[in-house]
Amino acid sequence: MAEFTVPEVDYTRYSNYQLVVIPLIILAVALLIIASWYVLTGSPVTQGIAFTGGTEITVETDGATTTQIVEAFSVEPESVQAVPTANTYIVTFQSNGNSGVAVTDLTRQAEQAGFEVQSAYEVSPSFGATTQTLALGGVGVAFLGMSVLVFLMFRVFVPSIAVVVSAFSDIAISVALMNVLGIELSLGTVAALLMIIGYSVDSDILLNNHVLRRSGDFYESTYRAMRTGVTMTLTSIIAMSVMAAVATAFGIQLLAAIGTVLVFGLIADLMNTYLLNLSLLRWYKFKGVAR
């Protein structure tokens, strides 16, 4: 029977600077991508119709091309995405380009073009704006609540700020990769970002608790925390990778997006927990306390 063992890393070979520089460079690149996206589009991440308002229609065609699908409608779609199911496409119309065309009119135009409409739904811009406020507000409240809880738990600045910075970096990297991979912000991906906050805090608090409150020297405590934390995170990465692959194969875009965001967020969490957070903890234990 196969057995997985987390290898012990010899952190004494690396200075704090060597550990922290890679996560900080990647965080800087992620923030640059987000800032550039905001300058170019007016939003730090591409938003789906759940937040902007619009119409989404799933049609099955008789071998029509993307150009023919676009020409079938009186307004130009925002996107036409092929689904792995044969000759099935998801046609999206953003509210700002919809020009007041109702979902019933778009459905009728699709049927007149000989397409079979499998599903169609519409989100009004006002409802989308309200949903956006609630969803992003929820992320903000979750992050703020996490920060307060961490400071109450440890009551020491450096270990607490290490957890908060690591969680922030996980979110920033995930959002930047959403832009790069063309994943829209939706209620599903907002849920994925909330889960990333949870995973990040879990692994960071596990490390901090072992180092600050358990017996044993720094490196022994670190390895004990890594055995649990790395195993937990790798298991989640494998599970989310399988979910994303299966969802992609069956054309379930929402689950594919959630799985992809979680996979990259958890990979970022491994880096930030055991490089960024650990380097700050080691500085605190060996230099900060001495001061």
From Swiss-Prot:
One Gene Ontology term from the biological process aspect of the record: protein targeting
A Pfam family that the UniProt record links to this protein: SecD_SecF_C
Keyword annotations from UniProtKB, A to Z: Cell membrane, Membrane, Protein transport, Translocation, Transmembrane, Transmembrane helix, Transport
GO terms under cellular component: plasma membrane
Top-level lineage group: Archaea
Family note: Belongs to the SecD/SecF family. SecF subfamily.
Quaternary state and interactors: Part of the protein translocation apparatus. Forms a complex with SecD.
Identification of the protein by name: Protein-export membrane protein SecF
Source organism of this protein record: Haloquadratum walsbyi (strain DSM 16790 / HBSQ001)
Recorded name of the encoding gene: secF
